[in-house]
From Swiss-Prot:
Residues 302-341 have a biased composition (Acidic residues). The keyword Endoplasmic reticulum does not apply. Part of the 50S ribosomal subunit. Forms part of the ribosomal stalk which helps the ribosome interact with GTP-bound translation factors. Forms a heptameric L10(L12)2(L12)2(L12)2 complex, where L10 forms an elongated spine to which the L12 dimers bind in a sequential fashion. Belongs to the universal ribosomal protein uL10 family. Has been called L10e and L10E in this organism; in this case 'e/E' is for E.coli-like, not eukaryotic-type protein. GO terms for cellular component: cytosolic large ribosomal subunit. GO terms for biological process: cytoplasmic translation; ribosomal large subunit assembly. The lineage of its organism: Archaea, Methanobacteriati, Methanobacteriota, Stenosarchaea group, Halobacteria. Residues 284-348 are annotated as: Disordered. The keyword Hydrolase does not apply. Pfam families: Ribosomal_L10, RL10P_insert. This is Large ribosomal subunit protein uL10.
Amino acid sequence: MSAESERKTETIPEWKQEEVDAIVEMIESYESVGVVNIAGIPSRQLQDMRRDLHGTAELRVSRNTLLERALDDVDDGLEDLNGYITGQVGLIGTDDNPFSLFQELEASKTPAPIGAGEVAPNDIVIPEGDTGVDPGPFVGELQSVGADARIQEGSIQVLSDSTVLDTGEEVSQELSNVLNELGIEPKEVGLDLRAVFADGVLFEPEELELDIDEYRSDIQAAAGRAFNLSVNADYPTATTAPTMLQSARGNAKSLALQAAIEDPEVVPDLVSKADAQVRALASQIDDEEALPEELQGVEADVATEEPTDDQDDDTASEDDADADDAAEEADDDDDDDEDAGDALGAMF
């Protein structure tokens, strides 16, 4: 019998079974369930985090063995989370997707002091400027930890940004004291997501850390390309149909003008074209007595204004030009998120 089977069949105290049942109920009530690291978070701050999460997520802290048993009882692939239950951890459940959960947890982190013996999560820098500390022994403490410090203008000044500890190095008691004196909080305290399970898929933090601006830009560009493909391939969708109808209307109007097809929408333009041609012809006749009264005195330069075929095309295709403008706008990467999402989603 495997260790897992033994763990499932062994008898445990009633209070433990009740705790496991409560954890199982919590797990089954959410779409996404993850494991978070809570090491180093003071209990009061942990309670504040629980309160802040209320309404969007639930944090459950218990013995690791009971968390593992509950995940095994639920099954459905959730037992894969057992590999992340080490040290001080808790389970977090939410109906949000894993990406939203990760972003929420990252945004909720707050700066905190770093103590002696802790490992620097990033380079620790004492910034250039006035420390606000009066001249005294503190200048020597700054210099001893690697800061470029001097006494100037009646106070202790740091003359340039000074990196006093590199990422991954251990913080000394002396450096911890200096940082606390300066009010520098080089670490962030919060719930670190180790893994989250949703819709049968296990996600790790590296897969959830997205550049939102870049992602939005990619979606907008894809939406623009999809819009143009739909228009140019004559493949109508709910989003592109209005533009395609405008283009078709412009083409039909241009054809009607060139072929002199009598249509209620085209007749005014046909009359204008014929009038211009008559006036152009009249301007070439020297004997005004041969002309109707309304055409007498027509200036010769009017002939130069006779519409050409190209000009007819331009006049007839105003709606077509509007359609082209609409298509070009769809290719602009600066389209708002809603238009981009609608265009891409409605493509096929």
